[in-house]
């Protein structure tokens, strides 16, 4: 087989469909978020405003977080020095797990190298180790959850997205004696809709199922202390496992689960994705602790963030720019064409100094291509007006459909 020819042909198909991914070469400017420096292929540099960061609250630039990380490097050095089991458990890891358990009102927590790994390792381990387990997975769950369930090789039942009737029908049809787990997200990353957590917990109680809630797009963002949608709705105690990330609203890196002492110890003891990898650097753990502690105490970032989301949506509506209506902070501006979506993104970056990454298939279904915009507390009124003005101009240029008020 001509491997190079195969690779080239497969890549060419992405180019021809307008969905080949190109990384924007940018450098975040410390203390100047959401500004960044863009490096062109010819070596030229240009300032841009980032509108697609998952550093939702700008905590990656927060002075408390940065100082905590610097202090940890000065105190501990760069890396953890090993796996958690072999010399890699630094005291910062222990403190971080205590902080996370407290955030979600759980007995225990366990940190991983990323949110992807925490989902993959936890769901895969549960699927492998619990005899006869059936995992009921929402149809729009993240790839890390899908891959984890697949890795677990247990029975998997897909239920229609956020459809309680379909979930109950599938629970009712399953073996009543089989162990069950319902896996779902709180805020879904591409459409920005929110799961009916209470009603799912009611079904879990009725059919004797565990619950696994991915809160990666909600932790830090919702609830009086940033514990997510489950905290906001007073439901944390009803969930078996709450999973989250340190790399979005908390502005650092890593993933975690929280739950009972027994379930966290079970994953710690059996999950290969936890056991056989180097622990997070102590500096990242220190930064995460500072970020979590700040957001537990400060409502300012969350309130300001919601204000920015409302401002952006209002201006988009005024210009007839179609965006998906949802109750979260994620603002998907709908284009519906892969080539046009990429073209708009390119022109925004090259001509307007606005960086928004196009979202195309397979991340979203074909004909639902979009610009996934994520306002932050640090975007000004002028930033928002500049973004919407540029979109208005490009919408007319592409003859794209306008939203009707």
Swiss-Prot record:
Biological process (GO), any one: protoporphyrinogen IX biosynthetic process
Record PTM N6-(pyridoxal phosphate)lysine, positions in chain: 248
Names of the cofactor(s): pyridoxal 5'-phosphate
InterPro entries in the record: 4pyrrol_synth_NH2levulA_synth (IPR010961), Aminotrans_II_pyridoxalP_BS (IPR001917), Aminotransferase_I/II_large (IPR004839), AON_synthase_class-II (IPR050087), PyrdxlP-dep_Trfase (IPR015424), PyrdxlP-dep_Trfase_major (IPR015421), PyrdxlP-dep_Trfase_small (IPR015422)
EC number assigned by the record: 2.3.1.37
Record PANTHER family: 2-AMINO-3-KETOBUTYRATE COENZYME A LIGASE, MITOCHONDRIAL, CLASS II AMINOTRANSFERASE/8-AMINO-7-OXONONANOATE SYNTHASE
Family membership: Belongs to the class-II pyridoxal-phosphate-dependent aminotransferase family.
Protein name in UniProt: 5-aminolevulinate synthase
Organism: Rhizobium radiobacter (Agrobacterium tumefaciens)
Lineage: Bacteria, Pseudomonadati, Pseudomonadota, Alphaproteobacteria, Hyphomicrobiales
């Amino acid at each position: 087989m001509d491997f190079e020819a195969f690779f080239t042909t497969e890549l060419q198909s992405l180019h021809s469909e307008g969905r080949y991914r190109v990384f924007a070469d940018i450098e975040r400017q410390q203390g100047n978020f959401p500004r960044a420096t863009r490096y062109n292929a010819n070596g030229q540099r240009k300032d841009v405003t980032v509108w697609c960061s998952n550093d939702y609250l700008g905590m990656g630039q927060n002075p408390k977080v940065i100082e905590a990380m610097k202090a940890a490097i000065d105190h501990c050095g760069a890396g953890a020095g090993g796996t958690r089991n072999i010399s890699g458990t630094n005291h910062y890891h222990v403190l971080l797990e205590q902080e996370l358990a407290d955030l979600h009102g759980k007995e225990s927590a366990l940190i991983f190298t990323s949110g992807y790994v925490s989902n993959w390792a936890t769901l895969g381990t549960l699927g492998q180790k619990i005899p006869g387990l059936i995992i009921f997975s929402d149809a729009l769950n993240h790839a890390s959850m899908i891959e984890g369930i697949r890795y677990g090789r247990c029975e998997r039942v897909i239920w229609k997205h956020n459809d309680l009737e379909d979930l109950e029908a599938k629970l009712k049809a399953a073996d009543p004696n089989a162990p069950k787990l319902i896996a779902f997200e709180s805020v879904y990353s591409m459409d920005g809709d929110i799961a009916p957590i209470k009603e799912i917990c009611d079904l879990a109680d009725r059919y004797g199922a565990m619950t696994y809630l991915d809160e990666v797009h909600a932790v830090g963002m919702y609830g009086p202390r940033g514990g997510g949608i489950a905290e906001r709705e007073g439901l944390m105690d009803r969930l078996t496992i709450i999973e989250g990330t340190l790399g979005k609203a908390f502005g650092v890196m890593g993933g975690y689960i929280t739950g009972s002492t027994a379930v966290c110890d079970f994953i710690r003891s059996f999950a290969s994705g936890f056991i056989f990898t180097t622990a997070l650097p102590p500096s990242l753990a220190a930064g995460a602790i500072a970020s979590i502690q700040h957001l537990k105490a400060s409502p300012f970032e969350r309130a300001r963030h919601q204000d920015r989301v409302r401002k952006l949506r209002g201006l988009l509506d005024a210009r007839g720019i179609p965006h998906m209506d949802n109750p979260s902070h994620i603002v998907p501006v709908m284009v519906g064409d892969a080539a046009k979506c990429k073209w708009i993104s390119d022109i925004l970056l090259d001509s307007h100094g606005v960086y928004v990454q196009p979202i195309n298939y397979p991340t979203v279904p074909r004909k639902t291509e979009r610009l996934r915009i994520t306002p932050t507390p640090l975007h000004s009124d002028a930033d928002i007006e500049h973004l919407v003005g540029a979109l208005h101009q490009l919408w007319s240029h592409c003859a794209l459909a306008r939203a009707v008020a």
